[in-house]
Regions:
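Alpha/beta catalytic cores of nucleotide-metabolism and tRNA/nucleoside-modifying enzymes
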Residues: 1-4, 9-13, 19, 24-25, ...
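Short, solvent-exposed helix-helix connector turns and helix-capping sites enriched
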Residues: 52-53, 116-120, 192, 241-242, ...
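Alpha/beta enzyme core
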Residues: 81-112, 120-207
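Hydrophobic faces of well-ordered beta-strands that scaffold small-molecule active sites
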Residues: 13-17, 38-40, 68-72, 96, ...
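Glycine-rich, positively charged N-terminal anion/phosphate-binding segment
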Residues: 1-4, 9, 18-94
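Active-site beta-loop-alpha junctions enriched in small/polar residues
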Residues: 18-20, 43-45, 73-75, 101-103, ...
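Short glycine-enriched, charge-decorated loop/helix-capping segments at active-site entrances
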Residues: 57, 111-117, 185, 250-252
Length: 330
């Protein structure tokens, strides 16, 4: 599979863009675990134009994580065009991705993210403006099946996402990622891959189609490639507390000790990138969500302790207690 001139190999697996999750430290860790391409947290176009330091910091990229995509969002043509130029000039990403899928109220409720699905003409104008503004960088889009269930099909019976995919391709995108839910669903229920498959199997489409939604096992990955024919799959929430998932999805296995050591490395990376207090604050909720801790006796109390830890020493002591307990249980 290729996005522009970037060869991503056969059946690649991507790390999804996630706010307050996919910072450079986490991206590097997932890359080490086998992610083919990684995506940044989304960045506000308005904030980039205003040169807000917090948003500019999200443009930090290192060579070891390439190929890497930086994702931007917004609802103004001029702002998105200018933000795209800033991203390309400062970060030199391999791919520039446009977020037309974020369902959270503070984004979609203001007309950005998945809110753009209610204004397709503007969505297309933004996409074309960005693609024209950065012709040497592949522009891609991440979106959802539609705004809500009533809007899944056009009056003539054509699936909304099939029509949108064609129109996005026509204005210059070089790959399309589709999350298999509507905005109204948020993250409830199961992702519907049937419509993703219809986009991929549309003879008009020639750009890569990347499927996203409920990817957590190697069996599911196999089904998505074989049954729906997508060119790549993208993993999001299943990476929480489980950055090694990419190795597992490719058929690899890790011991309990290896998994716990990876979580400790995530702590170290977070602290080194920021500082001890803020690094711990950022990473501890990821550790508390790790599936390897589920099922141990009285984990609720242990989880609370983990979420209250303020130093590396304190957090590591809790992790080692859990390691010993898990070994005893096994």
């Amino acid at each position: 599979m290729k996005i522009g001139n970037i060869d991503l190999g056969h059946e690649p697996i991507f790390l999804a863009p996630m706010e307050d999750v996919t910072d450079i430290g986490f991206r590097l860790l997932c890359k080490q675990m086998g992610a083919t391409m990684v995506y940044s947290e989304f960045v506000s176009s308005d904030a980039l134009i205003r040169m807000v330091n917090k948003s500019l910091a999200k443009l930090q990229v290192c060579e070891d994580e390439r190929p890497v995509a930086i994702q931007i969002y917004g609802k103004d043509v001029d702002a998105m065009r200018e933000a795209a130029r800033i991203v390309v000039d400062q970060a030199h990403p391999d791919v520039l991705d446009l977020n037309f899928g974020c369902p959270v109220r503070k984004v979609a409720g203001k007309g950005a993210g998945s809110g753009m699905l209610q204004n397709v003409p503007l969505l297309l104008d933004i996409t074309k403006a960005v693609a024209d503004a950065v012709p040497d960088t592949p522009v891609t889009v991440k979106t959802r099946l539609g705004w809500d269930t009533p809007g899944l099909y056009l009056p003539d019976g054509t699936p909304f996402i099939v029509d949108l995919a064609e129109r996005l391709q026509d204005v210059g995108i070089q790959a399309l990622t589709i999350h298999g839910r509507t905005r109204a669903q948020m993250y409830q229920g199961e992702a519907d891959w049937t419509l993703i498959g219809e986009v991929k199997n549309n003879p008009r489409m020639h750009i890569p189609i990347i499927g996203n939604g409920d990817i957590s096992t190697k069996e599911r990955v196999r089904e998505c490639f074989d049954r729906y024919g997508v060119d790549a799959v993208m993993v999001g929430r299943a990476t929480f507390g489980r950055p090694w998932i990419f190795r597992e999805l490719q058929g690899g296995t890790l011991s309990l000790d290896e998994k716990i050591d990876i979580l400790k490395q995530q702590v170290i990376t977070s602290v080194e990138r920021i500082d001890e207090y803020r690094g711990i604050l950022h990473v501890r909720r990821h550790l508390a969500a790790s599936p390897i801790f589920k099922g141990i006796p009285n984990f609720r109390e242990t989880r609370i302790k983990m979420l209250r830890a303020e130093t590396v020493e304190e957090l590591f002591a809790i992790i080692e207690e859990i390691r010993a307990l898990l070994k005893t249980e096994n």
